[in-house]
């Protein structure tokens, strides 16, 4: 009555295997991976030809039909899954279990099948069990059972007898119940066995005991057939019949949850499936991580004090720990496979309890993880906090009993792949900048000007004769100070560049990220060479005898290398700054809220020092760069400090509330310091002398006067940027300073062209025009300042 047995099952449902991965393009489309088993709900979807409505892991959606393959029945006499059959049967008593007999026998009276609607309907009572059907990465399926009210639980992987003689077919275990798996499985009383295995494995058949009864047509399976399918003998428990992973009443929990290994004292040792078994045959792609281990004997003397998941039928990977006496759970083999992010497969999204081999080992790992977290939390900087890695290969498999902790582990598992790939960047990219757009632009421009001016200060000493003894002996100290300024300015700019790179890592524009990273790497390499050469010179205390060279060197020394790299830095810095300014809206957020009031702190003296500090630093730099005027500037700076402190602190020590920009008078101009006034006057004098040298048309004099104009102009720009504090005024000064720098560069290029093409009237005329443009802009710039 095979046909009748099939018809007795639930209504027919189609299953399909996914042939390819599918990434959904909309919310109605179903996502699945290759090898997933989908339940086809509807093949003719209105207005969606070529799409099927399918169900996977409790999610419904449309799936492309050309990516699915409908699964057909392999054998007509496949047993009907018992837990599907239970949906149609009457309620059962608390003393029944399921059994698959081996020989057709007339049925004996016994309890009916227990009702199994609890796993498919509504909320469960406190004593019910919730079933979840995971889709592990391997081809084997397991039924994970989560107990809500009592701790005993079991995860069983059951071999299919009718598949034992088909070793070439893919291995299967019970998954979502379907109706076409075979004939009806009848109930059996307690104290019965599924398989009656003789004591000697040489017997040709399987003979069940007299007490066993069955009413279904299961074909007789010989031992040779089982061996061909990977079985030598099967367990012969002396307790109740074969235990299926199905719901039972609380009173039966102690019987059905008893692990198979607990019968070891009453039964003979049995063999586990070999590597050629059709019961568990992982794909070749993952076979490297699974090494079949045939544990032929089960320990006889083991007494379990805690519930244990039976180990029968699982091929554990290499290095799996043995069970101890204080076992709480045994992790299934599907969860001992290497982590999901290492296999490029979908993570297990089900809320499966995870555990380690023993309570003691779990306690040790928890203690280690706690120490690591405390150590990592002790660091003050959150930008460069590194991801801590646990010394155990299974650190994230520890989970608490609460559903919240397990949910957090599941959610973190689903995003581990992307997290690992995005966090593999260097430590430099971990730092981020949280700056306003305007502040970021001002910062990068100020740092750029600082690098350019420091490099220009060193280039003033570089000429054809700068390594001669007389010249180098007079300027060795100034050159040393210039190298210090260059190293400091480049270091500050590189720190800012790393912060910009860290901010760019949060963007989706990979092209912008690559541009910023490449340009930052160029600056970083230059800075590394500067450090190496400067440290080499500092370690030798800048020996004059070694640095003096009266002839051309065949290979550059440390000082020459420093100058060569520093000469190229302004262009690299400018390129990086242009990238940041052009993409500022992507990298930084615009601060739309402008502060209307600015209040001084109660410590007015601190504010006074803050406003006076930049001129003091600039004064010190000028004292170092111009030793001849050291005494005069020292006296001037001390007077300036006293005057400015008296003016600022004496005005109003209380809150300072500036008028809104709309109410301010247009005549208000930035107030210049005495240093800036002096530099403006010096620049006008240098430009006048430059015009005089152009009239005489002497190349040497033209070069000298041009260098003087450029040097004074750079010092003026540097002083203006350092002394300006107010944001609105600072932006205005930075714009004028940037234009002034571009004009100085044009003058330098025109001077070079005029000298190389001397005595070309056209080149001299072009140089004259550039000098006039510089003078005109300088006068306009000076007029905008107070």
From Swiss-Prot:
<keyword id="KW-0130">Cell adhesion</keyword>
<feature type="modified residue" description="Phosphoserine">
    <location>
        <position position="305"/>
    </location>
</feature>
<comment type="subunit">
    <text>Interacts (via SH3 domain) with PTK2/FAK1 (via C-terminus).</text>
</comment>
<comment type="function">
    <text>Docking protein that plays a role in tyrosine kinase-based signaling related to cell adhesion and cell spreading. Regulates PTK2/FAK1 activity, focal adhesion integrity, and cell spreading.</text>
</comment>
<dbReference type="GO" id="GO:0007169">
    <property type="term" value="P:cell surface receptor protein tyrosine kinase signaling pathway"/>
</dbReference>
<dbReference type="GO" id="GO:1900026">
    <property type="term" value="P:positive regulation of substrate adhesion-dependent cell spreading"/>
</dbReference>
<feature type="region of interest" description="Disordered">
    <location>
        <begin position="612"/>
        <end position="670"/>
    </location>
</feature>
<dbReference type="GO" id="GO:0005856">
    <property type="term" value="C:cytoskeleton"/>
</dbReference>
<feature type="modified residue" description="Phosphoserine">
    <location>
        <position position="390"/>
    </location>
</feature>
<dbReference type="InterPro" id="IPR037362">
    <property type="entry name" value="CAS_fam"/>
</dbReference>
<dbReference type="Pfam" id="PF08824">
    <property type="entry name" value="Serine_rich"/>
</dbReference>
<dbReference type="GO" id="GO:0051897">
    <property type="term" value="P:positive regulation of phosphatidylinositol 3-kinase/protein kinase B signal transduction"/>
</dbReference>
<dbReference type="Pfam" id="PF12026">
    <property type="entry name" value="CAS_C"/>
</dbReference>
<protein>
    <recommendedName>
        <fullName>Cas scaffolding protein family member 4</fullName>
    </recommendedName>
</protein>
<feature type="compositionally biased region" description="Basic and acidic residues">
    <location>
        <begin position="630"/>
        <end position="642"/>
    </location>
</feature>
<dbReference type="GO" id="GO:0005737">
    <property type="term" value="C:cytoplasm"/>
</dbReference>
<feature type="compositionally biased region" description="Polar residues">
    <location>
        <begin position="273"/>
        <end position="295"/>
    </location>
</feature>
<dbReference type="InterPro" id="IPR021901">
    <property type="entry name" value="CAS_C"/>
</dbReference>
<dbReference type="InterPro" id="IPR035744">
    <property type="entry name" value="CASS4_SH3"/>
</dbReference>
<dbReference type="InterPro" id="IPR014928">
    <property type="entry name" value="Serine_rich_dom"/>
</dbReference>
<feature type="compositionally biased region" description="Basic and acidic residues">
    <location>
        <begin position="364"/>
        <end position="373"/>
    </location>
</feature>
<keyword id="KW-0597">Phosphoprotein</keyword>
<keyword id="KW-0963">Cytoplasm</keyword>
<dbReference type="InterPro" id="IPR036028">
    <property type="entry name" value="SH3-like_dom_sf"/>
</dbReference>
<feature type="modified residue" description="Phosphoserine">
    <location>
        <position position="376"/>
    </location>
</feature>
<dbReference type="GO" id="GO:0005925">
    <property type="term" value="C:focal adhesion"/>
</dbReference>
<feature type="modified residue" description="Phosphoserine">
    <location>
        <position position="249"/>
    </location>
</feature>
<feature type="region of interest" description="Disordered">
    <location>
        <begin position="262"/>
        <end position="295"/>
    </location>
</feature>
<comment type="similarity">
    <text>Belongs to the CAS family.</text>
</comment>
<keyword id="KW-0965">Cell junction</keyword>
<feature type="region of interest" description="Disordered">
    <location>
        <begin position="361"/>
        <end position="429"/>
    </location>
</feature>
<dbReference type="Pfam" id="PF14604">
    <property type="entry name" value="SH3_9"/>
</dbReference>
<dbReference type="GO" id="GO:1990782">
    <property type="term" value="F:protein tyrosine kinase binding"/>
</dbReference>
<dbReference type="InterPro" id="IPR038319">
    <property type="entry name" value="Serine_rich_sf"/>
</dbReference>
<dbReference type="GO" id="GO:0061098">
    <property type="term" value="P:positive regulation of protein tyrosine kinase activity"/>
</dbReference>
<dbReference type="GO" id="GO:0030335">
    <property type="term" value="P:positive regulation of cell migration"/>
</dbReference>
<feature type="compositionally biased region" description="Polar residues">
    <location>
        <begin position="374"/>
        <end position="391"/>
    </location>
</feature>
<dbReference type="GO" id="GO:0007155">
    <property type="term" value="P:cell adhesion"/>
</dbReference>
<keyword id="KW-0206">Cytoskeleton</keyword>
<feature type="modified residue" description="Phosphoserine">
    <location>
        <position position="200"/>
    </location>
</feature>
<feature type="domain" description="SH3">
    <location>
        <begin position="11"/>
        <end position="73"/>
    </location>
</feature>
<feature type="compositionally biased region" description="Low complexity">
    <location>
        <begin position="399"/>
        <end position="427"/>
    </location>
</feature>
């Amino acid at each position: 009555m095979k046909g009748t047995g099939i018809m007795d099952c639930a209504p027919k449902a189609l299953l399909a295997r996914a042939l390819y991965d599918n990434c959904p393009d909309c919310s109605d489309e179903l996502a699945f991976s290759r090898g997933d088993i989908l339940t086809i709900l509807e093949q003719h979807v209105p207005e969606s030809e070529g799409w099927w409505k399918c169900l996977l892991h409790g999610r419904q959606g449309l799936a492309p039909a050309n990516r699915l393959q409908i699964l057909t029945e392999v054998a007509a006499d496949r047993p009907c899954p018992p837990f599907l059959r239970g949906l149609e049967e009457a309620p059962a008593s608390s003393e029944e279990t399921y059994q698959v007999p081996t020989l057709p026998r007339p049925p004996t009276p016994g309890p009916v099948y227990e009702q199994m609607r609890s796993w498919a309907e509504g909320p469960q009572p406190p004593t019910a069990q919730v079933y979840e059907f995971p889709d592990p990465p391997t081809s084997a399926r397991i039924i994970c059972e989560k107990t809500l009210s009592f701790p005993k639980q079991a995860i069983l992987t059951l071999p299919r007898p009718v598949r034992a003689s088909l070793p070439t077919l893919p291995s299967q275990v019970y998954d979502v119940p379907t109706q076409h798996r075979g004939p009806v499985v009848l109930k059996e009383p307690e104290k019965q066995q599924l398989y009656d295995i003789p004591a000697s494995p040489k017997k040709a058949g399987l003979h069940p005991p007299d007490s066993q009864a069955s009413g279904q047509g299961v074909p007789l399976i010989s031992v040779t057939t089982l061996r061909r399918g990977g079985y030598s003998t099967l367990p012969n428990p002396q307790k109740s019949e074969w235990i299926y992973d199905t719901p039972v009443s609380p009173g039966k929990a102690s019987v059905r949850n008893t692990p198979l290994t607990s019968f070891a004292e009453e039964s003979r040792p049995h063999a586990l499936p070999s590597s050629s078994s059709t019961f568990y045959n992982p794909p070749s792609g993952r076979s490297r991580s699974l090494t079949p281990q045939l544990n032929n004997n089960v320990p006889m003397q083991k007494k379990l004090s805690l519930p244990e998941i039976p180990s029968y039928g699982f091929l554990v990977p290499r290095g799996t720990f043995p069970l101890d006496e204080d076992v709480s759970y045994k992790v299934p083999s599907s969860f001992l496979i290497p982590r999901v992010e290492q296999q490029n497969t979908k993570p297990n999204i089900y809320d499966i309890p995870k555990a380690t081999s023993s309570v003691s080992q779990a306690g040790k790992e928890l203690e280690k993880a706690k120490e690591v977290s405390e150590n990592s939390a002790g660091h003050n900087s959150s930008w460069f906090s590194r991801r801590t890695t646990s010394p155990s290969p299974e650190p994230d498999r520890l989970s608490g009993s609460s559903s919240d902790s397990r949910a957090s582990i599941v959610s973190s598992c689903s995003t581990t792949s992307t997290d690992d790939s995005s966090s593999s960047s260097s430590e430099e990219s971990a730092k981020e900048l949280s700056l306003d757009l305007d502040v970021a632009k001002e910062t990068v421009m100020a740092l750029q000007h600082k690098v350019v001016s420091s490099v220009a200060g060193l280039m003033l000493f570089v000429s054809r004769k700068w390594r001669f003894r007389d010249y180098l002996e007079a300027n060795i100290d100034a050159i040393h100070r210039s190298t210090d300024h260059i190293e400091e300015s480049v270091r500050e700019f590189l720190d800012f560049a790393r912060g910009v790179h860290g901010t760019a890592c949060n963007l989706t524009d990979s092209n912008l990220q690559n541009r910023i990273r490449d340009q930052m790497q160029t600056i970083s390499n230059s800075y590394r060479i500067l450090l190496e050469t400067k440290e080499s010179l500092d370690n030798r205390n800048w020996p004059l005898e070694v640095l003096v060279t009266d002839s051309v060197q065949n290979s550059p020394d440390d000082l020459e290398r420093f100058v060569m790299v520093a000469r190229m830095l302004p262009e690299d810095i400018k390129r990086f700054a242009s990238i940041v300014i052009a993409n500022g809206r992507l990298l930084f957020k615009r601060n739309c809220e402008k502060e209307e009031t600015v209040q001084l702190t109660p410590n007015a003296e601190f504010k006074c020092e803050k406003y006076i500090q930049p001129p003091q630093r600039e004064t010190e730099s000028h004292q170092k760069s111009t030793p001849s005027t050291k005494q005069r500037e020292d006296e001037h700076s001390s007077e300036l400090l006293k005057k400015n402190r008296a003016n600022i602190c004496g005005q109003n020590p209380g809150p300072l509330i500036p008028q809104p920009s709309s109410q301010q008078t247009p005549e208000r101009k930035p107030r210049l310091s005495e240093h800036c006034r002096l530099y403006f006057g010096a620049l006008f004098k240098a430009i006048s002398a430059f015009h005089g040298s152009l009239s005489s048309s002497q190349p040497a004099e033209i070069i000298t006067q041009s260098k003087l104009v450029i040097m004074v102009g750079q010092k003026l720009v540097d002083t203006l940027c350092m002394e300006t504090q107010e944001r609105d005024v600072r932006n205005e000064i930075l714009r004028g300073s940037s234009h002034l720098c571009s004009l100085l560069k044009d003058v330098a290029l025109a001077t070079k062209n005029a000298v190389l093409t001397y005595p070309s009237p056209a080149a001299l005329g072009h140089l004259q025009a550039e000098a006039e443009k510089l003078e005109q802009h300088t006068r306009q710039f000076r007029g905008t300042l107070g």
